Swiss-Prot record:
Keywords: Cell cycle, Cell division, Endoplasmic reticulum, Membrane, Microtubule, Mitosis, Phosphoprotein, Transmembrane, Transmembrane helix. It comes from the Eukaryota. This is Receptor expression-enhancing protein 3. It is found in: Endoplasmic reticulum membrane. Residues 198-212 have a biased composition (Acidic residues).
């Protein structure tokens, strides 16, 4: 674990930060010699990074593996050994020169295929999104239909009172009769009228004016309170439901 931490620190500081700073100075001073030197170093270090990634997964168990990595990075960077320049001129430059045309063709084909693959993936993604939207819409419509079917007729008739007048269905006969009775209530007193069998004589005779109403009630009261019947030459006076017999007074002579 300690060897891994030390090797990682050496690679980051001496393998990346130090060459990056001297590459900046070479670009700033426009020194072609230093510029070529650090360009060769970065090409070799890129290849080293690829090989290191694979070796860390397969050769990390090898004894002194991390110490060898530290020694190799210092050998590449040292101005005395110039390991990066040596590897580039002896191996990389001849290999890249012989395979340059093939590498360029592979790069062009990779760009074209990558563009086509990206377009195909985009179309498939749009198709999947459209299919998912249609499926969700169908499922929601089915849920709404099942919800409406679950309502009973009682629930549907209970909602009819909230509809506009023009859109209400025809009323049943008991509802029409009940509403008709409510409409025939007296507006002055708020008392519903009686049926035809229970109406009094005053109600059956029709409306009167105020004066006629008072006179009519007085006559009816006097007629109901007093009725005279003649039974076998004798008069009986009736006050309401009581009968009062009239006795003859004896005549008094003076």
């Amino acid at each position: 674990m300690v060897s891994w931490m030390i090797s990682r620190a050496v690679v980051l500081v001496f393998g990346m930060l130090y060459p990056a700073y001297y590459s900046y100075k070479a670009v700033k001073t426009k020194n072609v010699k230093e510029y070529v030197r650090w360009m060769m170093y970065w090409i070799v270090f890129a290849l080293y990074t690829v090989i290191e990634t694979v070796a860390d997964q397969t050769l990390a168990w090898f004894p002194l593996y991390y110490e060898l990595k530290i020694a190799f990075v210092i050998w590449l960077l040292s101005p005395y050994t110039r390991g990066a320049s040596l590897i580039y001129r002896k191996f990389l430059h001849p290999l890249l020169s012989s395979k340059e045309r093939e590498i360029d063709d592979y790069i062009v084909q990779a760009k074209e295929r990558g563009y086509e693959t990206m377009v195909n993936f985009g179309r498939q993604g749009l198709n999947l999104a459209a299919a998912a939207a249609v499926t969700a819409a169908v499922k929601s419509q089915g849920a709404i239909t099942e919800r409406l079917r679950s309502f009973s007729m009682h629930d549907l008739t209970a909602i009819q009172g909230d509809e506009p007048v023009g859109h209400r269905p025809y009323q049943t006969l008991p509802e029409a009769k009940r509403k008709g009775k409510q409409a025939t209530e007296s507006p002055a007193y708020g008392i519903p009228l009686k049926d035809g069998s229970e109406q009094t004589d005053e109600e059956a005779e029709g409306p009167f004016s105020d004066d006629e109403m008072v006179t009519h009630k007085a006559l009816r009261r006097s007629q109901s309170m007093k009725s005279v019947k003649t039974i076998k030459g004798r008069k009986e006076v009736r006050y309401g439901s009581l009968k009062y017999k009239v006795k003859k007074r004896p005549q008094v002579y003076f």
